[in-house]
Amino acid sequence: MRITDIFDAVRDGTYFDFMDFYSGNPNLFNKYAGMSLLQLSVVNDRYPDEKIKILRFLISEGADVNFLSPKDQRNALHIFYFSVLRPEPQYMLKITQLLIAAGVDINKKDKYGAIPLQYAITAVKLPTKTIMPVYQYLMDRGSNM
């Protein structure tokens, strides 16, 4: 994959690719994708360790974890569960923990009336037993059912 801008880097690159393009604004918005940098950082699980570094950095820089995509009104947690269909369970839990610790609204309803937990249950294609720790973590932190 050829990395040509910050949006390519945050979505498909490494932490170093991302840093090569980062200009100091953690809340840049890609009007074509309809997502913020933080949201784009969780649309796939390519280079999971790098994604975690990028996500941590964006959070530390003040990225808005509750920014809603204009089209579907989804926050980063909705987008992660809806986009990454077969994540490694530990990666899924780590992304969930980072976003919740940063203050993401786990009960925010999107345009379709769904909260992130609903996408974790219906969109993620892993056995329930495998990702039960994620469900439990969300519920322990106050997620509605």
Locations of regions flagged by a protein language model:
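Ankyrin-repeat boundary/"N-cap" motif
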Residues: 1-6, 29-44, 68-85, 109-124
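Ankyrin-repeat-protein effector appendages
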Residues: 1-6, 128-145
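Residues within HEAT/ARM-like alpha-solenoid scaffolds
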Residues: 46-50, 71-72, 87-94, 129, ...
